[in-house]
């Protein structure tokens, strides 16, 4: 999050709080910890992060709101694959929740502002109960497609899935495959027989 965000970060934090309450009811209040990190290092000081938590009425045990220096934030965002860019009214950034296992390794990434509860609770359940599994190829592919095809719509002030990006990719790959097929077929047809 960044604490000067007026809409998306507070809304996302409230949604996450609802899911954390649900997860803790199912898995136990001490079964996992939550850390929210402010990435706007000049402004997201520990005091600003504490104020943001109070403003969001997030006073759950085991949930820390933290700030960091610029170098630590650069390394953390690189390790987590979190992207953000300066924008005229703050930042454009991924909306991302990262599940980290007991060894400090990224276990699962969840993207989006209003994701379904099981997307976060199921990986937590796997880790808490010791039944971890890796994401299937299709789940991983689906997550990557969601990552690159989710766009911000300023008219509605919401993020949405843009099917045209996905459709354009499929058309492009199909066209490329067809051209490759035709080139190979023509090359084989014109090749001299030995």
Regions found by a protein language model. Give the residues of each.
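Sec-exported extracytoplasmic/periplasmic mature domains
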Residues: 21-28, 54-58, 78-82, 105, ...
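Extracytoplasmic/lumenal ectodomains and periplasmic regions of secretory and membrane proteins
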Residues: 86-145
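A residue-level detector for well-ordered beta-strand positions
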Residues: 98, 150-151
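Juxtamembrane/start-of-transmembrane alpha-helix segments at the extracytoplasmic/lumenal side
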Residues: 152-173
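Juxtamembrane interface at the cytosolic side of transmembrane helices
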Residues: 175-194
């Amino acid at each position: 999050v960044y604490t000067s965000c007026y809409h998306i970060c507070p809304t996302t934090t409230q949604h996450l709080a609802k899911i954390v309450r649900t997860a803790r009811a199912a898995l136990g209040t001490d079964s996992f910890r939550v850390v929210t990190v402010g990435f706007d290092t000049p402004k997201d000081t520990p005091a600003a992060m504490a104020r943001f938590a109070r403003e969001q009425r997030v006073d759950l045990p085991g949930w820390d709101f933290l700030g960091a220096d610029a170098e630590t934030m650069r390394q953390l965002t690189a390790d987590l694959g979190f992207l953000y860019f300066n924008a005229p009214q703050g930042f454009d950034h991924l909306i991302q929740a990262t599940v980290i296992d007991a060894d400090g390794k990224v276990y699962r990434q969840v993207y989006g502002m209003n994701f379904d509860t099981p997307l976060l609770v199921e990986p937590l359940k796997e880790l808490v109960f010791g039944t971890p599994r890796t994401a299937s190829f299709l789940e991983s592919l689906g997550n990557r497609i969601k990552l690159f095809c989710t766009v911000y719509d300023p008219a509605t002030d919401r993020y949405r899935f843009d099917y045209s990006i996905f459709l354009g990719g499929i058309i492009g790959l199909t066209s490329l495959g067809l051209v490759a097929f035709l080139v190979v077929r023509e090359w084989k047809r014109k090749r001299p027989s030995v």
